[in-house]
Structures are given as structure tokens and as C-alpha cells.
Amino acid sequence: VQRYVDLADPAAGCRPCPDYGRYWTCPPYDVPAADYWAGFDTVLLEGMQFHFTPAMLERRFDPEELAEYTRRLTAEQARQMDRALRRQYPGAAVLTTGGCTLCEECTRPMGRPCRHPQAVGYSLESLGCDVGAAARGELGWELLWPRRDKLP
């Protein structure tokens, strides 16, 4: 964990995000990131890859359409992975990339408590994890991101 986590200002990359403070999985948090990481003896890193057809890779998207498409695609896959990991490792904390995928609408902006406090998976990035470096170092994957109007 120490190789990929910067605790100097863990949520620095999150502040410019429009979701900052809108989801229970996004900062600011009540518990410092260092305290959260201190609760782990081991970390298992799993990832997912998406493979697109040549036609999809050539397709030009409206930027908003592309953002919505990739959000839906990753959210559904993340929900499936989350459920599988929770079945495989009962009681383990499951951290995610990006935001939470458990609910269609988060209760945080409404000032209400989380509906699933035992199941919420905080964002790795928000806890100071350099996900790109971890993917490269532990999985041998280079992360690719959509461009303005095309899939990577």
C-alpha cells in the first residue's frame, strides 16, 4: 500500500471533481485517510478491462454521450465485481475507483445517512491511492482513458 498511497493530501485530486462531497464514497471524510489505511493488514488489488470492437473504437461520440456510456458501463461492472468480492471475502472492506455504485441516488446531498454504511466502498483515489501506478505495478496494466469523443 505504501508504494501507491500519498497521505500528504490524499483528497487533493478529488477537490476539482463535481462529485466532491456529493457521495458518501467521496471526501471530505470524518476519518483521516491514514487512519483508514492503518486498519488493513492486507490489500488485494483486482481490476477490470474492457475490450471494444473495432467499430466501437472508430466511432465518434458526442462527448456527453461518451461520458454517460462509460459511466454506465463501468458502474454496472463495478457493481458485479463488488458483489462477487463481498461474497468471496465476507466482512472485507471493498474499495472502488471513482464513485459509489450501490444506489442510483446518494443520500449525502439530501443530508441523510448512507443507506448501506456497511457496504459502502470508498474511492481509492480519495484515500490517496495512485490507481494508475498501482495498476501498472501490480497488474501490469496501463490505464487508458476515453478522449473527448472516442474510446481509448
What function would you assign to each model-found segment?
Residues V1-P152:
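Catalytic cores of enzyme domains
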